[in-house]
Amino acid sequence: MNILVTGANGQLGNEMRVLAKDSSDKYIFTDVNQLKGQETTYLDITDLDSIRAMVKEFNVNAIVNCAAWTNVDGAEDPEKYELVEKLNATAPENLAKAMKEVDGLLVHISTDYVFGAEPYNTPCKENQTGTPTGVYGLTKLQGEQRIIATGCNHVIIRTAWLYSEFGKNFCKTMMNLTATKSELKVVFDQTGTPTYALDLAMAIIVILKDFADSVISTERQRVEKSSYPKSGIYHYSNEGVCSWFDFTKMIAEYNGTTACNVQPCYSSDFPSPVKRPSYSVLDKSKIKSVFGVEVPYWTDSLKKCINNLKSI
């Protein structure tokens, strides 16, 4: 199978690169920026014609869309709205149209921010609705809706609190801060679950294999083409629940930087243009039952990531 990955130089895209090394599938990694030491093909996903040309050139069967505008507060800048909307809503629609035309699959990464800041107290299910409180959440929700409207084969995965060995993220920031500061304040009134990008990438590999086995193999047998029956919205994060404060304490423990005095504080101590979800735990029952995806506990994955970072 030929798989095109967008946003290949980000956290998830880089984890897909790691897994692709042991895959028999052909991967085409794309981004708008070049990363030193990485083979990256230029692709502007806001340009539908460019996507179509690349899909045709490489005979693409599936696209994994890891690209997005992810700066939540920065998205509130009125001068940035057009770009945010293009990246988070128009681009996913373009990718969906391209896959619709070749009966391919679009795996699209979305976010817990589509639920807004609703005061939930139980894990959010895929069919729950919310009201996004900022431009980021709103445009990500629009992206989901536009993908579905094309009628393409799609798996939309909402995730949260992503971290990895790559790029800038909360885990790496707190590893540095707990190592260099004597005291640190971290919010305790926002609850969710961290997601190790490598675990999410492994789940995506499972989904791609399922698509290849159930749809592409059917087409090769010259049976009438059928849509992918598992198309839909899914949730993925690691197992367990914690606050940002809990997350930081565990980072310090695994990093060996517990000398830093980490103190809990309220979200109001760090004013932001966008209200963060107070409870954004995602229910993962669907992705586990439909695809048989294994979901590691968040502390186990965190320890693995930090050990990898310390060995670099």
Language-model-derived ranges and their functions:
Residues A203, D210-P271:
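Mid/C-terminal beta-alpha module of Rossmann-like enzyme folds, strongest
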Residues E82-N94, V114-I157, W161-S164:
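Catalytic helix-loop patch of NAD(P)-dependent Rossmann-fold dehydrogenases
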Residues I3-D22:
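N-terminal Rossmann NAD(P)H-binding glycine-rich loop of SDR-like oxidoreductase domains
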Residues I45-L87:
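NAD(P)H-binding glycine-rich loop region in Rossmannoid oxidoreductase-like domains
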Residues Q145-V206:
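NAD(P)-dependent short-chain dehydrogenase/reductase
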Residues N33-D47:
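Rossmann-fold cofactor-recognition segment
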Residues T6, T30, I63-A67, L106-T111, ...:
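SDR active-site strand-loop-helix element
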Residues W298-I312:
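Amphipathic terminal alpha-helices
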